[in-house]
UniProtKB/Swiss-Prot annotation:
Short name of any one Pfam family annotated for the protein: tRNA_bind
Protein name (record): Methionine--tRNA ligase
Role description: Is required not only for elongation of protein synthesis but also for the initiation of all mRNA translation through initiator tRNA(fMet) aminoacylation.
Domain tRNA-binding intervals: 608-718
Cofactor note: Binds 1 zinc ion per subunit.
Gene: metG
Species whose genome carries this gene: Aromatoleum aromaticum (strain DSM 19018 / LMG 30748 / EbN1) (Azoarcus sp. (strain EbN1))
Binding site for Zn(2+): C143, C146, C156, C159
Amino acid sequence: MPRKILVTNALPYANGDIHLGHLVGYIQGDIWVRYQRMRGNTVHYVCADDTHGTPVMLRAEKEGITPEALIGRVHGEHLRDFTDFGVAFDNYHSTHSVENRAYAEDVYTKLKAAELIDTRAIEQFYDPVKEMFLPDRFIKGECPKCGAADQYGDNCEACGAAYAPTELKNPHSAVSGAKPVLKTSEHYFFRLSDPRAVAFLREWTRGTNAAGTRRLQVEAANKMKEWLGDETVGDGGNTLSDWDISRDAPYFGFEIPGAPGKYFYVWLDAPIGYFASFRNLAEQRGDIAVDDFTDAVRAETAGTEMVHFIGKDILYFHALFWPAMLRFAGYRTPTQLCVNGFLTVDGAKMSKSRGTFITARSYVSRGLNPEWLRYYFATKSNGTMEDVDLSLDDMVAKVNSDLVGKYVNIASRCAGFIAKRFDGKLGASDPQATADFEAAFAAGTIAHAYEERDYGRALREIMRLADLANQYVNDHKPWELAKQEGQEAHLHVVCSTALTHFRDLTLYLKPVLPALAQKVEAFLAIDPLVWPQTWQPLPAAHTINPYAHLMTRVERKQIDALLEANRESLAPAAPAAKVASSQQRHAEKQQHEAQSAETAMPHISIDDFTKVDLRIARIVGAEHVEGADKLIRLRLDIGESENGQAKLRQVFAGIKSAYDPATLVGRLTVMVANLAPRKMKFGVSEGMVLAASSADDKSSGIYLLSPDTGAASGMRVK
């Protein structure tokens, strides 16, 4: 039975441009939606602009326009950028809408009825000139720890200290420059620390959905444990505090019912925007039963799903506040959170001074193909919270090698012969061609990888098939057959078979490269490709259209021009830009310190290095180790055999905090093959797999090393 899924992406804030860092998560979501639709599932894909809050209000004031005018303009800009990159929402709405107001008020009213709303008096800074309470980020002063000037009200960019705004020395308003005064105001709180909420969240964050899939990736679930604690010990170690859901006027947002001058905090109504956009879509369409996807009882009866694609910076809101709000207001909770990491460029934080803080608009306006980036981001996505590094040289190499050199090359080498020699009509397919059989055989592997959002694994398998298809062409040499008398029939079969292989590859690449797939469908004169139930070659006598160039190579000069277009002047920064430049200097300092720490190792000789036997290993089995907090048991194929059978190695790897075992099976990694076996209480570990982590423990990530496309089990790393 087809699945019925509501899919959302995180709502971008209506106070800035879409940049490449944003696009990581949106492209991941769009690929998954396209794959599900190719499988025949019903998917509603919605998003919206997150429009409320002090920053929007102040930016509109600075521009001399209303907040409504600002968010209207930004809405058009955001939708244009998403469309250019093939992110095809069914509806792109706004949180400043009648639907969102209705949902926000309903959720609040039901939480209040459940006795989960409190009011308390709090003391906070107030700007006497602007006559407004100041959020932490709109208060500046000297750090109470290190004395650094021009620091925000919640943390110091120079020393990293966290503190309350009232601890700042010589504070001033970042809005007016005035010295703020302390005033008391009544605020509204969602009682997240209530035992009912804590018990629910412990179960929800650690559990599985109706399909048996984890609601949270293993890394996300482990992070939630830090906040929710262990219910078997005392008070459980719960560190959740009640959540302030109100802000004082002036504020751009929705006023709280029965509380004049008090507004819903932006993070209360922002995720509710998912429901609002969906209801707005239903009103446009007229054939969607909204409550089947949003009401707790009806959603369970209808068997619908709700999947959120978000960045790890907003995990706290989506894994704690959002499901608790929904649960106690009578709405359905998310089926799954798909959390992506941050984007770095060439191994470092995006930087305006280096030109790597790249907006979507500048990328498109410089003439770069958005599908180059879609493909590259997909190759780096593995369904975990790992950060994605955009290595610009690697992107050039991957696109040119994989898409142009392998994939498009199949059609460009064979289509001309069909047009010139056979009037555009295909012949019979070669029944002995193994590439077609391999393509059919790989369907399950690729489908599973797409389902798990392990797009990198899917694309590695697809490129393996592309290698087989190219090998078929190379073995039969159609360019030589065309010169030989009496080889017309053979030439016809070879070129027709190659184009069937090309069709198969296009089908698999379609979720990632929808625009290119559409061109191929037109070239081959076929119906839109859907996930196959059975595999059939393109029929004999089928007429294809003349071949037109499908994709150009990436030139390094295009990348250099893009960086230059995004590089800010290195002249002294204007006062308004001091904050950003200070942050960048601090980030670059941290990066330099980390690099220094990680490279300060004694030299070894080449003879020492050659003693280490590094092999490519395929993970054929992975499972948790009972009684071990950090270990996963891996079974590895490094090309060894015994009595004609593959001999597998067992390795215990301390990567449990970063990986779900199910996502590791089939993946290639690097293993130290000649490490002496080590006897542990769980068994014997017969080697070591390689992973990266921060040398100074400031970053908690663990990143398993994976070789590039083309590597195979047993190959030596030299």
